[in-house]
């Protein structure tokens, strides 16, 4: 019995020494740090030491909140799993006719597949291939094949008053110059006079209105409103103070098919190719002999731009491209939701009652808990050797959307924190990684919703956020 007691005592001493040799993880007191934020702000935060497989902070980690552009993390992982790195968006010219004596006897089919980076210049170069093949006249119709996508070209829950803004341009199958154009306003007029609106000739768009220059008494109460009419016509209303230099306003294209068709016809004329047919917009995929094609940059390049610059067009184009490739049918935003969830759930990601309405995070319908986003970050960390996604995250103080993030641009956070941002009105989110003082990888998710500083000037309204993030991530670094 004495011998057994000695063994037991020795074993207890050994276990005690082992327990003291392991690192201890006291949860970061996020609650106290949130006192720096404006009253009424809602915060969800969760962090995990990846090396130690230990949650080191959890404050409202299970609460559903607006994910904003951190949603692009879901899109990036799903795209990596559903599409290979050689994936490229293809814009193609096809025909069901024959080329003879300088004539294309048949329809010209232009197949768009949602290339979010297609430019007017690239489209012109593509159409110029027809001229190189000796085509001088098209004896048929212009057929736009946009069948890769279906239903609306905007997600459910996109704010109506943002729909004319270029960051909200429809990520349609036919997407030229991000489906964005600009008009120039000359308001160097006397009070009461009408502002001159000029649309550059390359845009097949009409912008009109009765905007007037206001005097100094009325100017503080002025605002400009845009009303969208059919056939890509825009009416600008309101007033503004006198501006001594012309300035530009950017608008989102509303009817993307009509916009693309008009640009194609103009470019055919510029190339000296005669066309007098109709424009057809069939719902079904069109077949024909390939005449020429243009390819976008490959998937890794698209993802890097999407993540670094928070490019909404790329995100939502990939969102539906994933669905098209996954289900082999025309993709709506709703089908994109099903595809992304299905792909990630197969990797063990649990969405529960989460709502995913789009790939960009623009929708106010999106509801995600910090712990769900954290599970995707964990998946990235564990599979980075094949995903290569960490290199796409913005780097604090270096590039992307956190190059100037006030709370992260000083040591030890600068060049250390990598994170996808998420911003809507009242929303300041981060989802990413950092290396702590011991050299261990830490994944974190910060969701701040309902952030409002009332009437504070824009220069000072972020001061509480900067202080909160500086304190929080310095604490996280110590753990």
Swiss-Prot record:
Q: Which cysteines are joined by disulfide bonds?
A: none
Q: In which pathway does it act?
A: Cell wall biogenesis; peptidoglycan biosynthesis
* Record-listed substrate binding positions: 420
Coiled coil location: none
Q: Name one GO biological process term.
A: response to antibiotic
Signal peptide positions are 1-26
GO molecular function, a single term: serine-type carboxypeptidase activity
Subcellular location field:
Periplasm
Q: Which UniProt keywords are present, listed alphabetically?
A: Antibiotic resistance, Cell cycle, Cell division, Cell shape, Cell wall biogenesis/degradation, Hydrolase, Peptidoglycan synthesis, Periplasm, Signal
Listed under catalytic activity are:
Preferential cleavage: (Ac)2-L-Lys-D-Ala-|-D-Ala. Also transpeptidation of peptidyl-alanyl moieties that are N-acyl substituents of D-alanine
E.C. number? 3.4.16.4, 3.4.21.-
Q: Which InterPro entries match?
A: Beta-lactam/transpept-like (IPR012338), Peptidase_S13 (IPR000667)
Active site (UniProt): 69, 72, 310
A Gene Ontology cellular-component term: periplasmic space
Q: Which NCBIfam families match?
A: PBP4, PRK11113.1
Functional description taken from the UniProt entry: Not involved in transpeptidation but exclusively catalyzes a DD-carboxypeptidase and DD-endopeptidase reaction.
Family listed: Belongs to the peptidase S13 family.
* Protein name as catalogued: D-alanyl-D-alanine carboxypeptidase DacB
| Native organism | Haemophilus influenzae (strain ATCC 51907 / DSM 11121 / KW20 / Rd)
Q: From which lineage does this chain's organism come?
A: Bacteria, Pseudomonadati, Pseudomonadota, Gammaproteobacteria, Pasteurellales
